[in-house]
Amino acid sequence: MDPLQTRIVNTTDADKPLIYWLFDQAISYQQKNGFPAWKGYDKDALQAEIANHLQYKIVNGPDILGVFSISYTDPGTWGERDTGNALFLHRTITNPNFKGQKVFEQIRDWAVRFAREKRLGYIRMDTWTDNPQLIAYYQGYGFRVVAQRTTSDAPDLPEQNRNLNVTLLEMPL
């Protein structure tokens, strides 16, 4: 993989089969390795993200290295800490064929540039509190732990994000 050939662009409807495969692979990996696992994923929410240009893919030549979504608000997870001054990264999944190739680092770098262009003060994300390995992984990329909380059961949250004990992480810009 040549990092200079890597691009981040919006996903399209044509990408849906691969997106669903990536989610299935991520869930399988989580379960096999004893990590907290998504209980499924909301295809309607993913379709809305695609339609609203909020889901992205990282590509290198013909290969899709991973997918992720963004938002500019996340009150269901961040509560009163959501002040409208952040870019939120969600559902970041690396294609298992490209693990170990610093795909997340490229996503983080893109997010920093994108958030700065939008004059936002933070990049934020969350992950399961009972996955200290993943928390440490994100800390290794410059994120700091802000808080821990339980997400709501609100219908505006994707199914896989409801009633979770999460650790909130942010990177000041």
Residue ranges and their predicted role:
Residues 102:
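Glycine-rich phosphate-binding loop
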Residues 105, 117, 129-147, 155-157:
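Conserved active-site alpha-helix within GNAT-family acetyltransferase domains
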Residues 6-21:
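A short beta-loop-alpha structural element at the N-terminal edge
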Residues 13, 25-33, 37-97, 105-110, ...:
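Acetyl-CoA-dependent GNAT
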Residues 106-122:
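Conserved acyl-CoA
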Residues 121, 128-131, 151-173:
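C-terminal "cap" of GNAT-fold acetyltransferases
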